[in-house]
């Protein structure tokens, strides 16, 4: 059984126009605060060496408060300046795993979730994996699962733009892949995998700019979305000595997400086109170097260009260019009798790239972060005694 309390997190969004003489006219001045209480429990039961049954339950209690100093016209009948909502979310699942042979594993999961007073349909999933070769640990995997996602509180109520008419996403996903792992214990390890996936989602929830005289976004349901692609992952770890360790991880994704549903209007040209702000290609490489209690991490990311409109028009405002991102982090670990501690310093956007992830909203240049992590050793001393 585990539990935690997530700290209060705040976000702000301000949009103002310069009307001259140093005066600003605020169009939007929104503040959003949320925190979460969480409890989780799980158990497992073996029957011989071939059957394993597991059960898990996760309970979240979300609290969200949003205020806007500007009065937002949500519809023609009322005006709101924010919202204050709480929602209980419960997720329960049971899984049966069976190994009929030494090389073959099969499992079935049944999951059901509650959002407020609404229960989802039963959500099944089936998984299979087969050890092709013990040499190189070459393994084939496949799965079929049902998808169901309820709108978040921000999807429903965020000011400005929340949409209380949203319906849940639903659909099916299929994937298959192959993986390998080789190495020598205490010296090095090398692993990799390739996965193909194919998803068909009804009522995909997508935030889109409203356009016209409005300056904010609103989530809408897209009737039918086909998301598919290939993901490649690889990792290498090396013990340089007793005190030095080196690690390298990389991934590449090709992930088209195409609208296959109904047009929103007569002039809608989104059918058969990539969803706005969803990159088709992305990649990341992370390097790690550890010496005693010191940790150095370097991360490089790539995101391909993204369209800003459902028409996928190649115009000045119809897409945002690709960008590269470089981050570096240095961390020092400490250990006390009562807690494990770490101090971390990070440099984000190391080369001060000029880029945007959303049209017209420049992202920060080089910036710096400092973290202090404290993990109390509650009960550990007693357990040793």
Where are these predicted regions, by residue range?
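Membrane-embedded beta-barrel scaffold of Gram-negative outer-membrane proteins
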Residues: 2-14, 131-133, 139-141, 168-228, ...
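Transmembrane beta-strands of outer-membrane beta-barrel pores
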Residues: 3-11, 59-65, 88-90, 110-116, ...
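Residues that define the transmembrane beta-barrel architecture of outer-membrane proteins
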Residues: 33-37, 84-90, 120-122, 170-174, ...
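Short loop/turn motifs that connect adjacent beta-strands in outer-membrane beta-barrel proteins
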Residues: 46-52, 102-103, 133-138, 183-190, ...
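C-terminal beta-signal and adjacent terminal beta-strands/loops
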Residues: 302-311, 321, 327-385
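Outer-membrane beta-barrel translocator domains and adjoining extracellular loop/strand segments
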Residues: 10-24, 66-74, 118-124, 153-159, ...
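Gram-negative outer-membrane beta-barrel transporters
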Residues: 99-104, 196-200, 221-308, 338-340, ...
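Face-selective signature of the C-terminal outer-membrane beta-barrel domain
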Residues: 1-119, 127, 131, 193-196, ...
């Amino acid at each position: 059984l585990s539990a935690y309390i997530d700290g209060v997190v705040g976000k702000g969004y301000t949009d103002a126009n310069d009307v001259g003489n140093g005066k600003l006219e605020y169009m939007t001045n929104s503040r959003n605060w949320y925190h979460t209480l969480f409890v989780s429990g799980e158990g497992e039961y073996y029957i011989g060496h071939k059957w394993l049954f597991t059960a898990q339950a996760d309970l979240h209690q979300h609290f969200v408060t949003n205020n806007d100093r500007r009065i937002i016209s949500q519809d023609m009948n009322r005006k709101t300046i924010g919202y204050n909502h709480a929602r209980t979310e419960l997720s329960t699942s049971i899984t049966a795993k069976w190994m009929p042979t030494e090389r073959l594993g099969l499992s079935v999961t049944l999951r059901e979730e509650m959002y407020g007073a609404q229960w989802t349909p039963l959500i099944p999933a089936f998984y299979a994996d087969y050890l092709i070769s013990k040499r190189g640990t070459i393994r084939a995997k496949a799965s079929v699962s049902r998808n169901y996602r309820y709108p978040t509180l921000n999807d429903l109520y965020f000011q400005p733009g929340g949409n209380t008419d949203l319906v849940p996403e639903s659909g099916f996903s299929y994937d298959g892949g192959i993986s390998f792992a080789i190495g020598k214990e205490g010296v090095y390890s090398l692993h990799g995998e390739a996965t193909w996936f194919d998803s068909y989602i009804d009522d995909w929830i997508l935030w889109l700019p409203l356009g016209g005289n409005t300056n904010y976004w609103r989530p809408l349901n897209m009737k039918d979305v086909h998301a598919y692609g290939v993901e490649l992952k690889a990792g290498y770890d090396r013990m340089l000595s007793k005190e030095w360790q080196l690690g390298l991880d990389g991934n590449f994704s090709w992930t088209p997400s195409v609208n296959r549903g109904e047009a929103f209007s007569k002039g809608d040209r989104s059918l058969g086109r990539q969803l706005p702000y969803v990159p088709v290609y992305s990649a990341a490489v992370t390097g790690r170097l550890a010496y005693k209690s010191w940790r150095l991490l370097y991360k490089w990311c790539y995101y391909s260009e993204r369209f800003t409109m459902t028409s996928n028009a190649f115009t000045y405002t119809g897409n945002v260019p690709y960008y590269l991102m470089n981050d570096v982090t240095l961390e020092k670990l400490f250990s006390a009798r009562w807690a494990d501690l770490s101090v971390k310093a990070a440099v984000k956007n190391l080369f001060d790239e000029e880029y945007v992830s959303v049209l017209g909203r420049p992202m920060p240049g080089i910036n710096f972060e400092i973290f202090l992590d404290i993990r109390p050793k509650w009960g550990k001393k007693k357990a040793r005694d």
